[in-house]
Regions:
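Non-catalytic helical/linker scaffolds that mediate oligomerization, partner binding
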Residues: 1-477
């Protein structure tokens, strides 16, 4: 079994029912929809296809809505053709609505002239092109000198390292997209360019305003700004999970700082028992090639050794030539890394004293699984918290997570080592054990006489945290 979960971005290369089924068979656990691209009609069609295929295959596939956030981009180009920017030439970025050419391009951010000053760096297209600000004119035009030129295409990202950008954390577009996501009942929402805890609090308030029932939707904070690292602990405290978004992070920071930032973020998430996804360019060469580079393979494995819960594919599945092969490769790398994780894992389960019974029981169950030849740990949960806490202890056996809640069932597909089961509500310990045995005997190699560990909150008729642990022999009443 593979414990690390795989997030796949859905796009033109994989948005048919046939391709989605192949992604699921290859190992996809979560489908990401990137709201920087596409219309609501496009996303609604993809969601409908994902739901149909997942139901047909009887597989719990969560949907992650990734909001664009305050991304600053260049505008359109004359005749929609790329232009070549040459080193040393002057180039203007303007808020005026003009078609772009080799002399100027417009930007989606009207506040750019007010935020930058002479000497500031402007990076285009994930840092591939670099400009230096020389002056600002008329409140609309930023005159720059091209430091590192290259080919500029339409709608490319603009990064401003070291510049305090006064963009809102939740844009009008984000609010419209969030309302759409609530309507579509997505399982997770990712917020881009989180800089402080208040950014996460803002989107949580927006969810409540849209629909009080949507308040439980977990928020994944994408950490891609230096300010996010300055406020790391407070962001992780309020978010339900975090994403190591290495694309923009690697532009805002020096590239050599990104591996350290990745380890810091993963460590903080695990210490606080929050979900963490590692993303961006993990198998980037597979957009065009059927096999990855050796460096990419090592990158995926090292993220797993660092303690990530999930790894993510972006362009590899959304627009690449080898989407299915990319997922298969990601799954095989994860399985191989997990086979050696005991030797190379670089983090340890937090061992602090706790007054939380569910945390103490999760630790005890994980230690018991190491000491005895149990086949699995079964946990009953309504919200998914018990499964998530147990996942963060990194037991050496699968976690079978039983829930009567359909949304929790899907959301648990993002949790490391968790196999979700949707079952009727259990009103007694005997019913719980019956659910466990039915699942084991139907879907696993566990056989009568072997042992599993059960964690639950008793009495099951009340919503209580885990307070009960049992070492159970399968087939023995």
């Amino acid at each position: 079994m593979r414990y690390t979960k795989i997030v796949c971005t859905i796009g033109p290369a994989c948005n048919t029912e046939e391709k989605i089924a192949q992604l699921i068979d290859a190992g996809m656990n979560v489908a990401r929809l990137n709201f920087s691209h596409g219309t609501h009609q496009d996303h609604a069609a993809n969601i409908a296809r994902l739901r149909r295929v997942a139901n047909r295959l009887n597989r719990p596939i969560a949907i992650l809505q990734d909001l664009q956030g305050p991304k600053i981009r260049t505008g359109w180009l004359q005749d929609h053709k790329p232009v070549e920017l040459k080193d040393g030439a002057e180039f203007v970025i303007t808020t005026r609505a003009v078609p772009g050419d080799v002399r100027e391009v417009n930007t989606t951010y009207d506040g750019l002239p007010g935020d930058v000053k002479t000497g500031d760096r402007i990076l285009l297209d994930d840092g591939l092109l670099e400009l230096r600000v020389e002056r600002v004119a008329d409140g609309t035009d930023v005159h720059t000198r091209i430091v590192h030129g290259g080919i500029l295409k339409e709608h490319k990202g603009i990064n401003l390292p070291g510049v305090l950008v006064n963009t809102p954390s939740l844009t009008d577009k984000d609010r419209e997209d969030l309302a759409f996501g609530v309507q579509q009942q997505v399982e997770y929402v990712a917020l881009s360019f989180v800089r402080r805890a208040e950014d996460v609090a803002l989107i949580k308030r927006a969810l409540v305003e849209l629909d009080p029932k949507a308040a439980k939707t977990p928020i994944i904070a994408k950490l891609e700004k230096p300010a996010a690292l300055d406020n790391l602990d407070s962001i992780v405290d309020i978010a339900d999970g975090v994403m190591v978004a290495r694309g923009d992070l690697g532009v805002e920071l020096s590239p050599q700082q990104v591996p350290i930032a990745q380890k810091r973020i993963i460590e903080a998430a695990n210490r606080k028992r929050k979900i963490v996804i590692t993303a961006t360019q993990m198998l980037d060469s597979m957009i065009h090639n059927p096999i990855p580079t050796r460096a990419e393979v090592s990158d995926v494995a090292n993220a797993i050794f660092d303690g990530t819960d999930a790894v993510m594919l972006s362009g590899e599945t959304a627009s690449g030539q080898y989407p299915i092969e990319s997922v298969k490769m990601m799954a095989s790398i994860a399985e191989e890394a997990e086979a050696h994780s005991g030797k190379y894992t670089r983090w340890e389960v937090p061992e602090e004293v706790t007054s939380d019974d569910s945390i103490a029981l999760a630790r005890a169950a994980s230690e018991l699984a190491h000491d005895r030849e149990v086949q699995a740990i079964a946990v009953f949960t309504l919200t998914g918290r018990n499964a998530r806490v147990l996942s963060k202890t990194r037991p050496n056996v699968p976690i079978l997570a039983f829930t009567p809640d359909a949304k929790t069932h899907l959301r648990m597909s993002l949790m490391w080592g968790v196999i979700p089961y949707l079952v009727p509500h259990a009103d007694s310990l005997e019913t719980m054990l019956a659910h466990v045995e039915a699942a084991l005997l139907l879907n696993s190699p566990v056989r009568p006489g072997q042992q599993v560990i059960l964690i639950a909150g008793l009495p099951p008729t009340k919503l209580v945290p885990a307070n009960f642990i049992l070492l159970h022999t399968v087939g023995r009443s």
